[in-house]
Swiss-Prot record:
Keyword Nucleotide-binding: yes
Source species: Rhodococcus opacus (strain B4)
Name of the protein this chain belongs to: Phosphoribosylformylglycinamidine synthase subunit PurL
GO cellular component: cytoplasm
Binding-site list for substrate: 108-111, 130, 259, 331-333, 559
Keywords on record: ATP-binding, Cytoplasm, Ligase, Magnesium, Metal-binding, Nucleotide-binding, Purine biosynthesis
Residues noted as binding ATP in the record, renumbered to the chain: 61, 105, 519, 556
Function: Part of the phosphoribosylformylglycinamidine synthase complex involved in the purines biosynthetic pathway. Catalyzes the ATP-dependent conversion of formylglycinamide ribonucleotide (FGAR) and glutamine to yield formylglycinamidine ribonucleotide (FGAM) and glutamate. The FGAM synthase complex is composed of three subunits. PurQ produces an ammonia molecule by converting glutamine to glutamate. PurL transfers the ammonia molecule to FGAR to form FGAM in an ATP-dependent manner.
Gene3D superfamilies, per the entry: PurM-like C-terminal domain, PurM-like, N-terminal domain
Subunit architecture: Monomer. Part of the FGAM synthase complex composed of 1 PurL, 1 PurQ and 2 PurS subunits.
Amino acid sequence: MSAHPVDTVTAATATPDVAQPFKELGLKDDEYARIKEILGRRPTEAELAMYSVMWSEHCSYKSSKVHLRYFGETTTDEMRSSMLAGIGENAGVVDIGDGWAVTFKVESHNHPSYVEPYQGAATGVGGIVRDIMAMGARPIAVMDQLRFGAADAPDTRRVVDGVVRGVGGYGNSLGLPNIGGETVFDESYAGNPLVNALCAGTMRVEDLHLAFASGAGNKIILFGARTGLDGIGGVSVLASETFDGDESGTGRKKLPAVQVGDPFTEKVLIECCLELYAAKLVVGIQDLGGAGLSCATSELAAAGDGGMHINLEQVPMRATGMTAAEVLSSESQERMCAVVTPENVDAFMAVCKKWDVLATDIGEVTDGDRLTISWHGETVVDVPPRTVAHEGPVYERPVQRPASQDALVANTTAGLKRPESADELKATLLKMIASPALCSRKWITEQYDRYVRGNTVLAENADSGVIRVDEKTGRGIALATDASGRYTALDPYAGAQLALAEAFRNVAVTGATPKAVSNCLNFGSPEDPGVMWQFQQAVRGLADGCATLGIPVTGGNVSFYNQTGSTAILPTPVVAVLGVIDDVHRRIPTGLGLEPGETLILLGDTNDEFDGSIWSQVEHGHLGGVPPKVDLEREQLLADILLAASRDGLVSAAHDLSEGGLAQAVVEAALAGETGCRILLPDDADPFVTLFSESSGRVLVAVPRTEETRFTGMCTARNLPWVRIGVVDEGSDSVEVQGQFSVSLAELRTTFEGTLPALFG
């Protein structure tokens, strides 16, 4: 037991005037007053720790909640029809047919990944995997959305190296394929990298588990790793000023605020959980992530039909002398908390022993509506659990469109010099594909295992990852994640919809049907009215877009305070779209050359839209103007036609157009198929606009010559604009833009793939 004096409920009642460090714990005066009002006394040290972490921005969504409600307001019953679990659960769950369900979610681990890039990224992966486990599913794949400072900035190499190794090291050790993502470099992320991790899992519909504690007398079992001092960063006053000393030593002060992960413990924990689920030994379950036991106990109790009592000293600890507040606040990784009926406890413990997973009975569900926690026989917590988990402060922060927004929008690309000659067009292409903005991410993705477990059908560099779910029927899922901070800075409403449109389109080009959305909303300080305007507009854009497309937001995450001083990151709403494909054998690949002599057809309208584009960034260091127009009805039409084409075998390859426009799409598709092609520019077209415009709602498809008439006829009948844009010449080893220039595949590959190894290799 700690030598630290125990601040009990009795002591707190008897000493109402004791000064407490609530401000150091991040609580405001009115929040502290509200806690005292709820309890009818001052909180104990342990209670103060619980409320401070659970009422933090990260856990309570106190600045975003009023805006996030809009997702619910715009989601119809029809949109919810296939959703088995949604916002408020550990992760969203969608019925994908044939008795299968998929759960998926995106979470951020941004700030820890700057402080300690390897562990920050690794534990970000571990945390989202446990969210998926807690729903009753087997995790099957991960993805990542990464944002770093300028590629040539001094500190970027440190952060990139650690984050990429952390994502790969943890995911690879778990045996989970990393099937895609995005990596963006921009100076706004210097000091504030974004590490957003997605995990997806599968289960039979009847195996869904939720986080709740019900049934008086049911036992609370903590299982997994021991509880240590790592991750008590948010509760800084509970730990020390230094990182020195052994965790178990008497002179220890504080370990780093960043959690330390052990993927091998988590891998065993996954198998243990799945066996517990299969044996029907779990009533309710919650993973221990942010806020640790404070979160797990209060959320389980709040969601149940009674109260809960915890004997905190029973928690297995790996550090001596821990206080009750430290045990409650620890964010040690690889831990789960389950509710188990008394008659099943022995069987539960036996399964854990089989997998060599430490499991301890730490309490039970009680009658009543209180969460009580004792520490060596003395009560240190006695609270209504809903007040901790769900009834924290809710702020309607000031929302104000920044005065600088008008000037930003007015600063268009109209006056920027454009390439005109064939040589200038070729030089522009080579410069753009070599830029950190568009170059190959192969140096990153090769550090990830993309095909472990044998169910990966498509992965990076495809537009979306495709995973087989059912080996007998071939049923699978497609997942894509997208975001554009540049477009969102120009117009947050449109920027969020452009991210949604691209992720939706990336799923559709594989031949899958988009079904559901998750998100991770990364913004600056909520105390800045301009940031809150960006956030409000992005939420509304995303929600309205999902309503138009008829797919629900199943859950997500908000990350605020991503800024250095007064400089915020580019507003970055990350959107993940889940699609379902009936048979992964009919998925549409990215690479050209599958069929000899394919015709290249460009679907959609190409307009002179360069504001916010990668061309304006790479060639001119420019950001301003109005983003490309979003047409979500067109996106739905594209998806419908690609689905029909996939089922009928009308297209042999497809690749969406986004950053870098047609030129980037052609280069990527040609290199993926190791096949050259000729691009035939329309007679009346501006070569620069045709090659580099970033107009939305476009897809490049390769069509076998025998199916061209049938495919184009289908597009014409559905009023989808199309133009024959080129041919794939059998045996070609170059990309030729007819009448302009030609570049060999060898030069394209060297240029495209050489940048990141030169910077970070």
